[in-house]
Amino acid sequence: MTKSMNFFQNIIKPFKRSSNRGLEDDIERIAAMEQKVFPFQVLVSATKDFHPTHKLGEGGFGPVFKGRLPDGRDIAVKKLSQVSRQGKNEFVNEAKLLAKVQHRNVVNLWGYCTHGDDKLLVYEYVVNESLDKVLFKSNRKSEIDWKQRFEIITGIARGLLYLHEDAPNCIIHRDIKAGNILLDEKWVPKIADFGMARLYQEDVTHVNTRVAGTNGYMAPEYVMHGVLSVKADVFSFGVLVLELVSGQKNSSFSMRHPDQTLLEWAFKLYKKGRTMEILDQDIAASADPDQVKLCVQIGLLCVQGDPHQRPSMRRVSLLLSRKPGHLEEPDHPGVPGSRYRRRTQRPSGAASLGTLSTTGSSTDSFGSNLNTNTGTGVRGTPASSKASTRSNATRSAGQSSSSDPHGKRHMSY
């Protein structure tokens, strides 16, 4: 009997009371934690009443605060902005769904909280900075040598494969970029900011919610035609791979070289047999030439203009995990404004979103820093036609919402 009591006391120890509340209250709180529900006062206490000194940054979906739970675990608490128009029940249902997404290379959502008009998400706290804070800083990029970069590429591929094919719902991220990749204490990459579009209703414009993605990473069919599929994430991944290999940011490269993008530059060198010139020279000494060439080829295949010509993340993961045999040659990369033969059948799991509005890269981070860049907004449809556009987008999305790469799960955007 004593052992049983000690076991029970150990369970409730993290919830030790500061006042004489009933034992039933503690049991209810334990049960709530099992269901990933965090009491508001626990989060208030953990973040010191959301004190400015605990603020990690401000992302497109609201501020993020660092906190510490009574059991000693560090957390990142995202307070969703009031732009979210979802009711409590809808928010809870979506949060429960996202909380089921568990993978080594995806930032884990530990739970959620609703309090009045406040809606909060509780994530694991990732110690190191986002990838862009390391990769694009001249005094820091050498901290991640080629071996680490290759492992980061492989980890991101596995995380995306999970979101696309193995998660409870097929999740299209829509904003894969260096700022949304967090690195833990062992430099293991974790995809952040996934599934956030599900927490916002369709009647909120893309400009306000920043769910359309980030300039320089978006697939051309998504930018120009509003066609969204898992292949849009594949394109963004390809851009990120080329950035990791070269140590250069696509958007910054275009500013220095107005006549071409990082993708076009890499493609030209690849076709000339000068692939190793693409490599970041700061890490050349640690690089494996065969791995570099493989990553460049995979990156270029992922950024093909025709989404049907891009590999799936499953194939990418397989190519990275073993020495490939024959790997097809990539064509010229796709960029917004480029042309490809549009097929009558959309890519698997594609949904038309109508006319898109694109924004810059304000990032929601759950680690030690937050990246908040601003890009150029592209105005969407006139106000008079927005309603019909949303209606068409909703119908189109609904027609494909039950399909995914395996045709088994609902799609999440």
Swiss-Prot record:
What organism is recorded for this protein? Arabidopsis thaliana (Mouse-ear cress)
Which molecular function GO terms apply here?
Answer: ATP binding; protein serine/threonine kinase activity
Q: Where is the composition biased (Low complexity)?
A: 348-368
Note whether DNA-binding occurs among the keywords.
no
As stated in the Swiss-Prot or TrEMBL entry, residues carrying the post-translational modification Phosphotyrosine are 123, 222
Give the matching CDD domains. STKc_IRAK (cd14066)
SUPFAM superfamilies to which the protein is assigned, alphabetical: Protein kinase-like (PK-like)
What family does the database annotate? Belongs to the protein kinase superfamily. Ser/Thr protein kinase family. CRK subfamily.
Domain called Protein kinase: residue spans: 50-335
EC class, as a word, reads transferase
Q: Where does this protein have compositionally biased stretches of type Polar residues?
A: 369-404
What reaction does this enzyme carry out catalytically? L-seryl-[protein] + ATP = O-phospho-L-seryl-[protein] + ADP + H(+); L-threonyl-[protein] + ATP = O-phospho-L-threonyl-[protein] + ADP + H(+)
- Coiled-coil residues are none
The record's annotation in InterPro entries points to: CR_Ser/Thr_kinase (IPR052059), Kinase-like_dom_sf (IPR011009), Prot_kinase_dom (IPR000719), Ser-Thr/Tyr_kinase_cat_dom (IPR001245), Ser/Thr_kinase_AS (IPR008271)
Q: Where is this region: Disordered?
A: 321-413
Q: Which PANTHER family match?
A: CYSTEINE-RICH RECEPTOR-LIKE PROTEIN KINASE 3
Recite the UniProt keywords alphabetically: ATP-binding, Kinase, Nucleotide-binding, Phosphoprotein, Serine/threonine-protein kinase, Transferase
> Organism's domain of life?
Eukaryota
- Where in the sequence is the active site? 175
The gene for this chain is: CRK43
Q: Which SMART domains match?
A: S_TKc
Q: What is this protein called?
A: Cysteine-rich receptor-like protein kinase 43
What EC number(s) is this enzyme filed under?
2.7.11.1
